[in-house]
A protein has these predicted regions:
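Compact, glycine-rich, soluble single-domain proteins
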Residues: 7-57, 65
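Intrinsic-disorder/low-complexity, polar/charged segments enriched in Ser/Thr/Lys/Arg/Asp/Glu/Gln
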Residues: 1-5, 60-62
Length: 89
C-alpha cells in the first residue's frame, strides 16, 4: 500500500477538470484508490465523491493506493496533478 499527502495550490481548489482526469486514470486500476480528506474517504474512481469534499486551495489530502502496479498508478496520478497545477511538486 502507498499513502502520500498533497497540498492543493490551484486557486479554484479541487475542481471538475482535474477531478475528472484523476477519476479517468484511477478507473483503469484494478485495485483500491482512495482520497482521504478531514477523516473521510472517497474512492478516486468516483468523481462525485471527490467533488463532494470541496477541497480548497491550501488544504491537504491523502491518496491511498493498494493493488498491483501501485507505483505506476501513483506516478500517473501525480502527472495529472502536476500537469494541471493542482498540487505542489
Amino acid at each position: 500500500m502507498i499513502k502520500k499527502t498533497y497540498v492543493i495550490i490551484d486557486k479554484e481548489g479541487m475542481h471538475a477538470r482535474p477531478a475528472s482526469l484523476l477519476t479517468k486514470a484511477a478507473i483503469k486500476f484494478p485495485g483500491r484508490v482512495e482520497l482521504l480528506f478531514k477523516g473521510k474517504k472517497a474512492s478516486l474512481k468516483s468523481i462525485i465523491g471527490i467533488m463532494g469534499f470541496g477541497i480548497k486551495q491550501g488544504e491537504s489530502f491523502d491518496l491511498e493506493i493498494e493493488g498491483p502496479n501501485e507505483a505506476q498508478l501513483l506516478n500517473d496520478l501525480e502527472n495529472v496533478m502536476f500537469d494541471n497545477n493542482l498540487v505542489e511538486k
